[in-house]
């Protein structure tokens, strides 16, 4: 827990939450969500998208970029542990834990996060690269 606290101490107050960030609004309780888990540092909820039966999002409660999350050390480790725990619970036949970085990866939220997806055979990661 100290890692997220340390991360929040390094960020200016304006970066701790963002009024324009959907995920910050969820953390603040200003938007509805189907919460799965919450502690002092992370929040897990069902994605509104339903491309596959299980689509969970794991976010830090402090507004951080994807890069900041992945460089956070203990916080990323805790998020990863929770991803595995919930993946095992919700998708006993298998799941993916992933993160998108930037436009080509179709990152739609600038608040860093992990995805846990599954509940169905997921197939290949991408189309055959030779088709591009």
Question: At which residue positions do the language-model features occur?
Answer:
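HIT superfamily nucleotide-processing domains
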Residues: 1-132
